[in-house]
Amino acid sequence: MKQQTKRLLKSLCMAVGVVLLSAVDPLAGYATERTIDIKHLGEGQSIVRVDAQAKYLLLPVEESSPESKLYMIVDNDVVRTFNVRLAVNKVDYFVPVDLSGYADKHISFNFQLAPESALCWKEMKLSDQFDSSNREKFRPAYHFSPAWGWMNDPNGMVYKDGEYHLFYQYNPYGSMWGNMHWGHAISKDLIHWEHQPVAIAPDALGTIFSGSCVVDKDNTAGFGAGAIVAFYTSASDRQVQSMAYSLDNGRTFKKYDRNPILTSTQRDFRDPKVFWHKESNKWIMVLAVGQEMQLYSSPNLKDWTYESSFGEGQGAHAGVWECPDLIELPVKGTELKKWVLICNINPGGPFGGSATQYFVGTFDGKQFVNESPALTKWMDYGKDHYATVTWSNAPEDRKIALAWMSNWEYANNVPTLQYRSANSVPRDLALYTKNGQTYLSSTPSPEMLKLRGKAQKKGTFKVDRSHEVNPILSDHTGTYEIEIKFKNNGADIMSFQLFNSKGEEVEMHYNLLDNTFTMDRRNSGATDFSKTFATATSAPISAAKEYTLRLLVDNCSICLLYTSDAADDLIGVD
């Protein structure tokens, strides 16, 4: 079956040149008369004094430039340190440095490793505005992305008082990895998000790596009943675990004055996932440590005791283990519940780069035991699905997962400028059995259905060699959903193509001879930003009589979900 659409970006790769050529100047109309006093000191060092009455200092960025280190100094004290790829020959975009909160203070910046001849000195400006309105034509519409800057792992996802909080790894000073903060957004429905100020910023212990949040309903930590408590990795030359807490439903956080709360001699020691274990009446922390997960317990979120380790001889080990999660789920069609340990690995994914594996088993408050040590189970068979974790305290005990929709092989090279990276759609997790094994299924959360407009039905037809549906939609803006239900009448291979008038296509096919489903994006558009992006990925499927495909298309991505009358499987290319 061939299916055509006027506009489809099969990868984050097609329209950036056009977008940049037609972009509106983000500084148009901004007041720039306020003073910036620049003193060059030689050997790449400069002192810049700015007018504290302005809200922002707008820094020009050129992504091909090396990083310069900036020290923000207020009344002779360093209050912020960060790196920026300052424009040397051209300006790719601007990033804001927030000066609010320092009115009537003396503000200066110590710039290091920035040449005196660089263009940045001429282009930096003071302003009371920063235009973060979208200038990227192919920014996803219903996958979350930052207003500007770099994003990777989802962090600290927690639900409280009708609000879903999404924190995430964030660089507000550029669209490449670095300067890790916790960004923040809030939603009431998992679909529509409101950007919030940075939640947690770097400090003397280091930048802010991944972690989790809990609602301390019974005030076990003593910060206050109902406090949102955040756990994160403070990263510098070494990695240690720290905590912060919020008493205003996540709007602001105060760092614990006795950080760090957990240390180690291990170099890779990060990404704490914390949850309450009712049976043992303790908090549990799962930490990624090299190529294993370590489990700790605590009565009060402050004092932690080592319990056990998991990982040796289990699953894939071609890369570092990261971003753990440990959740309990009922098994569909039974009265059983089992525990799932989610483990993200980089590199070592089935198709190169980063990916998410998981283990099913038991957990007694001290030790996790994998019920199938000989098997490696993958949560998603697309190449752009990593750092998967679930919301804490979700209503009705739902286990709602979110992933970073990218891959470390090429994440920094994806050709967007205003921002980089998006998340997967939220997915509800469940367990099911197949051939004596227990597997994890993930289905787009039912809130996604609210996005549907009026359906355009194409009716029932038989396919003899090929059948073309043209156009597949009479009108759309690059965001749509396709549902295909079909029966096989004896074919060994069934293929589908989604293509446009430019000859760009994504090909999908079932191979009933070896029970695999393949999605091929090698001809999906401009893929030359990375040698490893243009790939075909395959997933095992269950033989069945009837099949359902669900395609979620959102400007820069395709997520494919597969179900049949035999089992629930998931193939995602987000």
Walk through the language-model features, giving the residues of each.
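Bacterial N-terminal signal peptides
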Residues: 13-23
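Short tryptophan-centered beta-strand motifs in secreted/extracellular beta-sheet-rich domains
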Residues: 482-484, 545-555, 559-561
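Beta-rich carbohydrate-recognition and catalytic domains
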Residues: 32-272, 276-322, 330-381, 396, ...
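Glycine-aromatic-enriched beta-strand/loop faces of beta-sandwich-type recognition domains
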Residues: 256-259, 502-546
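Bacterial Sec-dependent signal peptides at the C-terminal "C-region" and cleavage site
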Residues: 23-33
